[in-house]
Amino acid sequence: MTKDFLLRLTEEHYGAGAFPIYGRLLEEQRLTRSGPLLPMWYCTAALRRAFGGENVLVLGCTNNSLLAHLLGATPVNPLPPHYHCPNCRHLIFDAHADDGWDLPNLACPECGAPMVADGHDLRSRSLIGESVVSLQVPQEQFAPVCAWLRDYWAQRDCQTDTEPYSDTEVMGLRLTLPEGVQGMF
């Protein structure tokens, strides 16, 4: 992953001049460069797109990563609470809010479009440590998600350290049913 790619990713979401955000991406790149997180995040992003996003709950070291969020691996944005305009990319941070999802509606002061309220103020330092990404899926989607993951990694000619693939773990991604749900494994 190059610095140009990270800059382009920043500008696509937040516009030109969002250098503190770009700086955070560079720091996350440095923290994740030598581990297995990036391939897992790409896989998780593709899985969320394939299964409609909201039916796949991503847990673990993904939710505090801006890079994972911008790649689409998690809906959780770890930046401090803010508004961003999807139309003109105008950005406003709100230092008084506890969480971006609680911000009131706001029209963009630049173009008048409705702004997106986002941000949960999560630090990237907790990316250091064990690289675990856990996925929770509804019971009726468990088998299709397992099959999709096997196909995804098989197409990339990847091997795992456990032969054959487990029913609950594929290439470091742990699959679980929501708490209290019985069956499937």
Model-derived segments and their meaning:
Residues M1-F185:
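Alpha-helical scaffold/interaction cores of sigma-54-like transcription cofactors
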